[in-house]
């Protein structure tokens, strides 16, 4: 009888997944105040396109507008509160009010954030600081003017 139980236990063990079969953990991050499913998708796409962490883009969006695409504060526009002149240096060619569109704002502001990410050497706190304060002179000092595109001469894909 013990022999039969041992054989059955070995058979069950052979059928179970071994330690080499890891099941990916699905993390369902709750939405931030004012964030929508569509807005999250746009943020994730802009982060991916510009090779910056989604968490960094989210942090700037929360800091600047709490996920409100129509946010205005003086000369600053939209989700990431970008100046039209800064957006133009990143390839923007529209009217300032066009920056109140979430997709348009993210396209140009995340390009600019990418430069802050490069200047910060992948330090999230420093990237937020450089985004808010401007990083032209730091990019120049580090020899990153061309790579960041902050001089306005870079040809951006549409």
Outline where the language-model segments fall:
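Sec-dependent bacterial lipoprotein signal peptides
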Residues: 1-15
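Short, functionally critical alpha-helical segments immediately adjacent to catalytic or ligand/cofactor-binding
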Residues: 52-67, 109, 128-132
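Export/targeting segments at the very N-terminus of extracytoplasmic proteins
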Residues: 26-62
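Bacterial Sec signal peptide processing site at the extreme N-terminus
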Residues: 13-32
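Substrate-binding/active-site groove segments that recognize
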Residues: 75-92
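Catalytic and binding regions of secreted/periplasmic enzymes and modules that target cell-wall glycans
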Residues: 110-149
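A short, structured beta-strand-centered segment in the mid-to-C-terminal lobe
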Residues: 95-104
